[in-house]
Amino acid sequence: MAKIIVVTSGKGGVGKTTTSASIATGLALRGYKTAVIDFDVGLRNLDLIMGCERRVVYDLINVIQGEATLNQALIKDKNCENLFILPASQTRDKDALTREGVEKVMQELSGKKMGFEYIICDSPAGIEQGALMALYFADEAIVTTNPEVSSVRDSDRILGILQSKSHKAEQGGSVKEHLLITRYSPERVAKGEMLSVQDICDILHIPLLGVIPESQNVLQASNSGEPVIHQDSVAASEAYKDVIARLLGENREMRFLEAEKKSFFKRLFGG
């Protein structure tokens, strides 16, 4: 059976889709057959970040409503042999996303015929239908937050939903929760403009999976249709690679928590 991981948050604009793209890509680069599903019906951004928007013919709702097969709707990634994208619909009503339909998709992806090992669910923000469907079947959840009070507070609400409205919760179990902090700037934390990692951990009380530093490279990668994890010697890329390692049970020291110390020459010449 495939492991189902939902990337979620209480607030929009925290980098969920960027994170979903890089985590799915990172797992595929490690050799795992991975599907990443866009649950944001009506908006659809995952295909843009993955650089496959011109190859979308069918979408998740087409599959759920029997208008296309999974094989017809899945888009093979141009960079990773083991990675496939299932886009959301831009035109359908969100109510078309049914629990029975999503369950059928998950079962087919997990089955022997398709043989996916990981399914990454890119959830819309908040508690709308797409978000509830994305998290319902999750084995694990990556709760994504910016180091801002409103973002962290809204993430706390999502934790409550995971603990009460997921399939695992209904069965008396629990979804394994991870905390991912995005757009983190130690310099801004030092100035009191952002919450610190410790502040966020103290509020949410879930294990820290990783810290993604604030970086223009993330925006540039998204605009070019390539997940930032593909970039070499870029802090955000290295941070996502660390996240993949920790998801797979490997020990990695937390990085990017402190401000980068400038060399003597950079300080001297203002670089």
Swiss-Prot record:
InterPro entries linked: CobQ/CobB/MinD/ParA_Nub-bd_dom (IPR002586), MinD (IPR010223), MinD_FleN (IPR025501), P-loop_NTPase (IPR027417), ParA/MinD_ATPase (IPR050625)
UniProt xrefs under CDD domains: MinD
Membrane topology term: Peripheral membrane protein
Residues bound to ATP: 11-18
Keywords from the named record: ATP-binding, Cell cycle, Cell division, Cell inner membrane, Cell membrane, Membrane, Nucleotide-binding, Septation
GO cellular component annotations of the record: cytoplasmic side of plasma membrane; cytosol
SUPFAM superfamilies in UniProt: P-loop containing nucleoside triphosphate hydrolases (SSF52540)
Compartments reported by the entry: Cell inner membrane
Gene3D superfamilies in the record: P-loop containing nucleotide triphosphate hydrolases
An example Gene Ontology molecular-function term: ATP hydrolysis activity
One GO term (biological process): division septum assembly
Primary role: ATPase required for the correct placement of the division site. Cell division inhibitors MinC and MinD act in concert to form an inhibitor capable of blocking formation of the polar Z ring septums. Rapidly oscillates between the poles of the cell to destabilize FtsZ filaments that have formed before they mature into polar Z rings.
Family stated for the protein in its record: Belongs to the ParA family. MinD subfamily.
Assembly mode: Interacts with MinC and FtsZ.
PANTHER family assigned to the protein according to its UniProt record, in alphabetical order: SEPTUM SITE-DETERMINING PROTEIN MIND HOMOLOG, CHLOROPLASTIC, SEPTUM SITE-DETERMINING PROTEIN MIND HOMOLOG, CHLOROPLASTIC-RELATED
Note: Present in outer membrane vesicle formulations which are used as vaccines in human.
Protein's UniProt name: Septum site-determining protein MinD
Provenance organism: Neisseria meningitidis serogroup B (strain ATCC BAA-335 / MC58)
Lineage: Bacteria, Pseudomonadati, Pseudomonadota, Betaproteobacteria, Neisseriales
